[in-house]
Amino acid sequence: MLTTRPGAGQYETPNYDQHVARAEICLADAYQTILTCDFAEHGRLLPALAGLTLEQWIAGVRQIGPALNVGQLTKAEGFAGVLRDNGIDPDPELVRALVDKDRELLLANGRLYPDALPFLRALRERGIKIAIVSNCSEGTRELLTELGVAALADTMVLSCEVGAAKPAAEIYQRALKQLGAAAEAAVFVDDQPGFCAGAAALGITTAQILRNGPGETAATAEGTPDGVRVVYSLAEVEAMFPA
């Protein structure tokens, strides 16, 4: 179930006194910004399929996670390594079954936030170029395509495909280059304060989105970097662009 602020069912753009004067492009994170995914079934079904305990599976996935995120390992290679490290023969059929189940569960449990498509459509109608900039492993491009995001984005810069992950400067710069814009012409939105800081350090106007609403502020505001706007909906991000 998605958590949104009161009244978020209707897409209304707030008015801000000041807009980003030169904003021409939008860089948007994927997970917990435009979409969410319930990974509970991953934790229940994949360890059982692998013949491991939940603890063994989680430890293994955490170990391979950074390499998956920058494309140094495929899911098949990573899962084979988890099996091997736990004394299980990485039989190709078992590895393929794990990869297929992981993909199936990602596609089945990924959900857009209600304001995601209206936000992307509104930006396109205003001629604002869009890049999805996500730290992710293989499967996310297919998920974004299935959910209708790929059709509305001008480009998708995925860490597993470009070999760099937020908050490294390279991934933001790759998105800027693909959209043909300078950092000063961009607005970036992400839920993670560290990733917001990485963008802000390049001169990109940045917003941290708190999907649980104003009540989340007390727990997270301390981690919001200086100069980063806190927002609770994508409508607020749209309002950061000049009318």
Can you say where each PLM-predicted feature lies in the sequence?
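Asp-based, Mg2+/Mn2+-dependent phosphohydrolase catalytic module
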Residues: 1-28, 117, 121-124, 133, ...
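Short beta-strand/loop segments at the ligand-binding rim of alpha/beta enzyme cores
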Residues: 128-130
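N-terminal helical cap/lid subdomain that shapes the substrate entry/recognition surface
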Residues: 2-118, 125-126
